[in-house]
Regions:
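Glycosyltransferase catalytic domains, chiefly GT-A lineage
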Residues: 1-268
Length: 268
């Protein structure tokens, strides 16, 4: 049975993590998800203070302070910078969903936008993969052309964790336990230590754990750091493609986009 035909036998969730100030961008991402996955439950895990309970009736809001004990949370708040803090909770978010009987869960950054069903991911999960990750780039990126180049990937990680899809398998739970332990005190952005928040740790994923698939497709995670290799075209319906209309983009990662008054600007 294939997930792409809307014949779901499994309970699935898609979620993101955000503070209250960034929740509007998360709402835009969720709107794009709902268009193509109306049957999937949506979750917003909120870091810090700020009430977003009424953001959207279709989005389940969970506050991080409700799923972590007070001592753990207060220690992280005093120890981590804001970005480090927000990324340090991701394993607990997956575990929370799995503990509530979700068979699979997909994390998406708030600055992603979905243009179609993620068919290739759905099929890998249905076939029993422990999880699915996407690389930052599939071809060399020259540092003299782009602000971000190959050297940057060596520092920040092979995989971009703006997207992470996991099945609730014993191997996945083992990975989450390991990852959670690492991120309690080592979710820092410090190139001297060879660390980049939660992301760099998963360079070890293919060798430490079984069943994780690397989705090498330019149709996933198109972003400023890899777009130089591709010709992007659009149709009259607002869909985007790579090279020709046979290659529909699944999602674009609008990393670096910030709202300025009534328009959005791209900040490298």
């Amino acid at each position: 049975m294939s997930l792409v035909n809307n014949e779901f036998s499994k309970k699935q969730a898609i979620f993101t993590v955000s503070d209250a100030n960034y929740a509007v961008m998360a709402l835009t991402m969720f709107d794009s998800v709902s268009e193509h996955y109306p049957e999937i439950d949506l979750f917003l895990f909120v870091v810090g203070k700020g009430n977003v309970d009424k953001i959207d009736n279709n989005i389940n809001v969970i506050y991080i302070h409700d799923i972590l004990d007070d001592i753990d949370l207060s220690q992280r708040i005093s120890y981590y910078l804001q970005v480090e803090l927000a990324t340090s909770f991701r394993p607990q978010c997956f575990e929370h969903l799995f503990s509530h009987n979700y068979d699979s869960a997909i994390y998406l950054d708030p600055d992603l936008y979905i243009f179609r069903r993620m068919t290739e991911v759905d099929e890998l999960l249905e076939d029993g993969a422990s999880g699915v990750v996407t690389p930052h780039a599939l071809k060399t990126v020259r540092s003299n052309v782009a602000v971000i180049g190959d050297e940057t990937f060596l520092k920040c990680g092979i995989f971009n964790l703006g997207f992470l899809a996991l099945n609730c398998t014993s191997e996945t739970l083992r990975m989450l336990s390991w990852w959670k332990d690492k991120l309690k005190w080592q979710c820092v952005a410090d190139s001297r230590l060879g660390l980049f928040v939660d992301q760099k740790w998963l360079d070890l994923l293919p060798t430490y754990f079984d069943g994780f698939e690397i989705l090498k497709s330019p149709l996933y995670n198109l972003a400023p750091w890899n777009s130089e290799h591709y010709s992007v075209i659009s149709d009259l319906h607002g869909k985007f493609y790579i090279d020709n209309f046979d290659n529909p983009i699944a999602f674009i990662h609008f990393s670096g986009v910030r709202r300025a008054s009534n328009h959005f600007s791209f900040l490298k």
